[in-house]
Amino acid sequence: MNLFSNFRQFGVFIAICIAIFTLNLYLEFRSYEAFKTKPYNFIKADLLFSDKRQGKNSKYYVLQFKSDNFIFYTRSKSLPKCSSCEVGVITKNLKFKDYITGRFFLPSFKISKLDINDSLANILKNTIISQHQNPKMQELYSALYLATPMSKELRQNVTHWGIAHIIAISGFHLSVIFIFVFFVARFTIAPLQDRYFPYLNLRFYISLILFILMGFYLYILDFTPSFLRSYIMGVVGFLLLSRGLKVFSFGNLILAILIGLAFSPQLLFSIGFYFSCLGVYFIFLYIYHFGNRSDLSSLKRILMHTLILEIFVFLAMNIPVYYFFPIASWYQISVIPLSYVFIIFYPVSLFLHLFGIGGLFDDFMIRFIEFAPAQGKANLELWQFIGYNIIALLAIYKKWIMLLLALLGLFVYIFALI
């Protein structure tokens, strides 16, 4: 059973989403106009990361700051000695098309320390950082738990392993956290339920509480695009499942995308949101063409489908990923077994950080992260990227087109390495 009983209902939903999107776009434009009322402005922002660069005559720092409304980059000759700063910026050349993306460059003329109480996100970040001596490990775990930006060097390290999507908080993390906490809570509360409230649907209420907590986590992460998409899909799926409606469908993916874009127009320009939606699309595509309810009764078939699905998604995502991040390595294929290792590693590492011993595996982790080198480069043109996305959409209609996606991804992967 589907959420919309006819096309008219779906059309009304789309019209509502367009209206909300238009309203939010207008509000963003008003915010942009207010921000540009003066040729310069002072912004209260948190310093997310710094990257030292070599210029023609001297070295400088590229700084990334996060304010309440957006993230911006600037340059400085020296590294600011503050985590919460007041940044004087020049706004006269800022365009709305850049402002609406939520990430842009602003020239700065002054950076000073701001004496304010740290936000919860900063407190958590400092708690994580304090448990690690190595700066790269500080970045890694901050990115893993709080979706903070990674330096160019660390980003290259995780790209060589093909695990950027594992580090970036997404639906994978939501699933791991949800399943882990759900089963712990279920087996802890079940004896009490049997004795005191046997009439309650324990799974429903545990799931409801977990989604509320995940919503608070999403707020702490400042609505990270990939996690936002997965959260919307999770909530929609939960509501559909509780009412006996179909969960795994392309319509529900479209539903989540439309809701996300309606309330946050910036997602139109988010690569992370695009990757997140495309990854789920490929999962649904495999289920659509190869899914069979009878296979759920066999553990062997479940494991077989899981492995094939992992391989298919890895190959199908190659062309979109390489268009934006062209570095290729033979080690990237190890992301398939590493995904299963991560299911154990993620809750264990989180548990260790809760007890202040998060740096227990740092020596091993730093050697592992830096082990994989870059071995090739995939140079893709815009027309190839657009053409591949069109083929991906057509794969809904034919199974052989879906298989073609994997073959094209395999071809690009091998060609980049030979």
Write out the residue ranges for each language-model feature.
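Aromatic-rich juxtamembrane segments at the membrane interface
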Residues: 111-230
